Amino acid sequence: MGIVLARIDNRLLHGIVATQWAGRSGAQRIMIIDDTVANNELTKASMKLARPTGMAISIITEETALNNFKAGKYNDHTVFVLVKKPETLVKLTEIGVKVPELVVEIGRAHV
């Protein structure tokens, strides 16, 4: 199945995302794609604490995400992707990954 929902949000995983969007997505896994977060153990640990109970979480670099999606690693998963930059999603779509629904966080407004 792959990605069921993607969200661009500079805060990535926080209360509203964990309590509202994650459940709404129907995903089995939250995937945070961000080089800075993936390489910072303290930030990764705090993101893992924020994940909803019962959902798997992956916090990976952009390169790892691209390689894993190319290899079909998530074909049998439902994934809710969180990114800070739209360019990350553009790169995923350029390799053929489908993003059926996108939420863009702009300040406190949702687009």
PLM segments and residue spans:
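Long, hydrophobic N-terminal alpha-helical segment
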Residues: 2-51, 56
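Ordered, amphipathic secondary-structure segments that act as subunit-interaction surfaces
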Residues: 60-105
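Conserved small/polar residues in nucleotide/adenosyl-binding loops
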Residues: 109-111
